[in-house]
Amino acid sequence: MISLLLILVMSLFFSGIIIRTKSILSGRKGPGILQPMLDILRLWKKGSVVSTTTSFIFQIAPTAYLASVIMAVLMIPHGDKPGFISFDGDFIMFAYVLAFGKFLMIISALDTGSSFEGMGASREALFSMLVEPAFFILLGSFALFTGQNSFRDIFSSLHYGSQISYLLGGLASFVLVMIAMIENSRMPLDDPKTHLELTMVHEVMILDNSGFDLGLINYTTNLKFAMYGALISNFFIGLLPLEFSIPMFLAIQIGFAITVGIIESFMARFRMGHNPQFVFILTSVSLLIFFGVLLVLGKFV
C-alpha cells in the first residue's frame, strides 16, 4: 500500500519536473512544477464532447485506461513490502493489465472513424508489440537471477555482489526508462507537442477526446511515468528500512523525471521508419541482461 501512496504523490509532480527541466535547459523561465496538474484539474471541471459516430467504447476507454494503470500500480512492491496485489507470476498479469488499457485506447481511436486516429492507433500497437519481448526477457532474467517469480520476491532477493551484477542493474534501469518513454509516447519516438498529424503517434489517437476524458488520459500518462519510476527504484531499494527507502524512492523518481527532461531537450525525434528499429534494440539489451545473468549464475556454456 505504501508503494501506491508514493506513486500517487509523485504522479502529481512528474510531468511538471520534466517541463521544468526542459525550461531550464532551454534558458526559459517556464511554468511551475504543478502547472500540468492544474491543467488536468481544469479539464476535469469540463464536460466531454462525444461524436455521434462513436459507440460506448469511446466513452469508457479513458476510464478503463486509468483503471488498468491503477490496477498495475497495485501490484508494485516497495522493497520487501508487497504491493496490494501480490502473487506468483504477478509481473505477467502486470504487463497484460496495461495491455488491456492500451487495447481499449486503440479501439476507441478506431471507433471514431477517423483515418488519422486509425494511423496513430496502428503505430501505437506496433510499438507496444515490439516493447513486450524486452519487458518479459528483462523480468524473466531477474526471476532466473533470484530464483523467485513475483515482483516482491524478485526485488527483495536481488543481491549485487559482482561488477557484472551491478552492470545488470544499470542496463535494467536503462531498459525501463526507454520502455516508459515509449509507452508514454515521448521523445525520441514521438513529440507530445507536435501539431503535424502525419508524425503523431499518441496525440493523434486522442484528437477526439476532450474535457474530463482528456484529463483522465493526461493524468494516466503521469501515473504511468511514476509507476515505471517505482519499478526502477525497486532495483536499488532492496531491504532498506522505510526511513531510508522512501527518500531513495523520491530521489530516484525525481532523477528519472530529470533524465526524461534532459533526453527530450537534447534528442530530436527519430524518423518514423527508424522507430521500430530503435524499439527492437531494447530486446537486444534485455538479451544482454539475460546472458549476464547466465554468466553470474555460472550457467553460460
Roles of regions detected by a PLM:
Residues M1-F14, S86-A99, G161-E183, F244-S245:
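Alpha-helical transmembrane segments
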Residues G27-W44, D191-F212:
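Juxtamembrane inter-helical linkers in multi-pass membrane proteins
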Residues R42-F58, S115-M119, I206-F212:
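Cytosolic juxtamembrane amphipathic/interface segments immediately preceding
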Residues I70-I85, M105-S114, L144-S150, L297-F300:
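Transmembrane alpha-helix boundary signature
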Residues F142-G169:
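Juxtamembrane/interfacial segments at transmembrane-helix boundaries in multi-pass membrane proteins
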Residues E203-I206, S210-S245, F249-G261:
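Alpha-helical transmembrane segments of helical membrane proteins, especially in multi-pass transport
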Residues T259-L288:
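Interfacial loop-to-transmembrane junctions
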Residues I289-V301:
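Juxtamembrane boundary at the C-terminal end of a transmembrane helix
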